[in-house]
Amino acid sequence: MQQTDALLDRFLAGLAPASPLAVWAHGSLAAGDHVEGRSDLDLIAVLPQPPGPGAVWRVAVLHNRLRAEPLAGGLHCTYLSPDTADDAGRRHLTWAHERLLRRPVTPVTRAELHTSGRVLHGAPPADVLPPVPDGELAAFVLRDQRDYWRPYVDRADLWTRDVWVDLGMLTHARATVTLREGRLISKREALDVLPGLGAPEEVVEDIRHAATADRSRPTRRGR
């Protein structure tokens, strides 16, 4: 993953003047099923204090300078501070989809960081983030399935699109395991769960093929 490592090195070097206390990877980069050129780079940076206007500007400059780097479009980073890390509902400064926004660090992400987070710099997640109670994790996963995904089930037009089929089915499989067993699984592991939930084997294999394909090359479904 030479391009991935080069981008991470550039990002860490650019962030160094902000004196981050920690930088972590979560998602596929930490879970071991990252595919260079297809998977996103999901990061969390812990700054000494909540970013004020000047720090927000410097974060924007950093990410804009990285725009021309290979894979930079998939680099997402949320910025925490020790004073704000405890609140799972708080919205934090985030760079995602090539723009600044604010969003929370969900119980799923927090649990991922504790179980499989990859330390790129500084302190480990356990030194900054409180553990996620089992009830809080299960409640969030159930709410996400019920309030976000369930209303889309009746939108037949969406389910002819690869991204909805892939993400929807994998998310449902992962949620099912979390609710039944109280643990998180990766997208790769979710593929093995799908047949037991009634997913057609042909669709599962198509998702598996797409998940391991280079984003720049066409897959069977013409991505």
Regions found by a protein language model. Give the residues of each.
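Catalytic metal-binding acidic patch
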Residues: G27-V61, R65, G74-S81
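Short, solvent-exposed loop/turn segments at secondary-structure junctions
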Residues: A30-A31, T84, R174-V177
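Helical scaffold of the NTase/Pol beta-like nucleotidyltransferase catalytic core
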Residues: M1-W24, G54-A55
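Conserved NTP/Mg2+-binding pocket subregion across the NTase superfamily
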Residues: V61-R161, M169
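Hydrophobic alpha-helical packing segments in soluble, helical-rich domains
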Residues: V153-R188
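Structured mid-to-C-terminal alpha-helical surface segments
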Residues: R183-R223
